[in-house]
Amino acid sequence: MKSVNHLVLTPGSLSLAQLREISRHKLTLELAPEAINDINISAQIVQKVLDEGRTVYGINTGFGLLANTKIAPEDLQLLQRSIVLSHAAGTGQYMQDATVRLMMVLKINSLSRGFSGIRLEVINFLISLVNAEVYPCVPEKGSVGASGDLAPLAHMCLPLLGEGEMSYQGQIISAAEGLEIAGLKPIDLAAKEGLALLNGTQASTALALEGLFHAEDLFAASSVIGAMSVEAAMGSRSPFDPRIHAARGQKGQIDSAMVFRYLLGEESEISLSHANCEKVQDPYSLRCQPQVLGACLTQIRQAAEVLATEANGVTDNPLVFQDTGDIISGGNFHAEPVAMAADNLAIAIAELGAIAERRIALLIDSSLSKLPPFLVKNGGVNSGFMIAQVTAAALASENKTYAHPASVDSLPTSANQEDHVSMATFAARRLRDMSENTRGVLAIELLAAAQGLDFRAPLTPSKAVAQAKAELREVVAYYDKDRYFAPDIEAATDLLYTASFNAYLPLGVLPSL
């Protein structure tokens, strides 16, 4: 990358760090010059098929169950237009511009590999839309994640035909207006181009990548806030001893324990104050954090590997092979790897919230934490964090339902030609809602743990924990008596949305950071 906001794309080489940037920041894009030759050769192979009068699926045939129907040469251009229009059958709210931007870059990356038989001018059209920050309006629902994300990608490609709606600077405009802003005119798609644009897993992958980056942020926040709860509850540092975790050998657990040691430091005034207490063991929500968060970290890392591969792969069909000139039909559009990665991320996100909710319950329970009941003075007159914990329980419980695997829920489509599908798009899309729920739980724990630390004063926590608490206190004051609670949760949630707690972790723990 030349800078944060300009990317010279060498097809097939996007890093997770670059993908995170693309998902969260606007950028300008240009294609590396060395990619152009592969694109042109691939398109020439498709043209050769037409010149020789051969019949090849996806070039001069129908699609799906109609694959055996040969299309007359004079109808090929109409075929490409028709497939885009007919497949733009999505429903629901529009995806966020950032999601569409990431999806477009993923599609550009795939098409530019030279396996798709698509002309350079079509790829440059998509690049121009990204650079002009004019994004197609893409409904969230309508893909089952096999034969690609057909409906979402069709909506993404409508502007090439001058059809559909677009988003520009927060406003919904017509495709005609959007193309004028970008300095473009509609183009006629050539043979295979409509299918190449629509086939692929880019919608599912974009949504899953966003879920991955949220999961990374939540892991970092869980670690920082979990360490704060250890200090607030006067928990032991012994469970983070590296010898314990080395004996088991689980890499995620070992690294999570290392993060807790990094955050808690050697000792603090709080930890020294109870070094010789009679308590033998802490509850699991404190003591087993490396085991639980470490397992989540393992799932995050595995999903990251799958999604980084998918982001750089070619997932349309059929594929053009330049070395032999062969055009071969396969099934790379089937998004099962994305669906399973998203399912695993869903479990990790749910568990980060579930154990955080238990730590909140621990902190407000005076018999366990030795803090004032519900973390407030003058209990009875004040209810303190009583209902905030109920809110956390509601959010954590909702995620349990969301965490049901989507990849096992297949329905046949296209008259049973497409008889097993991945449901990757929903598997990935729900990660946003799950992340919002877990972020809400962590925001409440952050408020509770900071409140607990205030009750421990003048004893001080570790340096990192004190710094994190200070960040919160810049936006939320100490809870001295009952007040309107929702704004406090909102402010703490907004703080977590900044992902500032990512900086508290050592480099290399999370895949994209």
Swiss-Prot record:
Protein name in the entry: Histidine ammonia-lyase
Fill in the PTM field for this protein: Contains an active site 4-methylidene-imidazol-5-one (MIO), which is formed autocatalytically by cyclization and dehydration of residues Ala-Ser-Gly.
Give the Gene Ontology MF terms in alphabetical order: histidine ammonia-lyase activity
At the top of the EC hierarchy, this enzyme's class is lyase
Family membership:
Belongs to the PAL/histidase family.
**Annotated localization:** Cytoplasm
Q: Which UniProt keywords apply?
A: Cytoplasm, Histidine metabolism, Lyase
Task: Name the domain of life.
Answer: Bacteria
Q: List-wise, which residues carry 2,3-didehydroalanine (Ser)? A: 147
EC number of the protein = 4.3.1.3
Extract the PANTHER family matched here: HISTIDINE AMMONIA-LYASE
> Which SUPFAM superfamilies does this one have?
L-aspartase-like (SSF48557)
A biological process (GO) annotation for this entry?
A: L-histidine catabolic process
Q: At which residues is the cross-link 5-imidazolinone (Ala-Gly) found?
A: 146-148
Gene Ontology cellular-component terms for this entry are: cytoplasm
Species source reads Shewanella oneidensis (strain ATCC 700550 / JCM 31522 / CIP 106686 / LMG 19005 / NCIMB 14063 / MR-1)
Q: Which reaction does it catalyse?
A: L-histidine = trans-urocanate + NH4(+)
- Give the pathway annotation: Amino-acid degradation; L-histidine degradation into L-glutamate; N-formimidoyl-L-glutamate from L-histidine: step 1/3
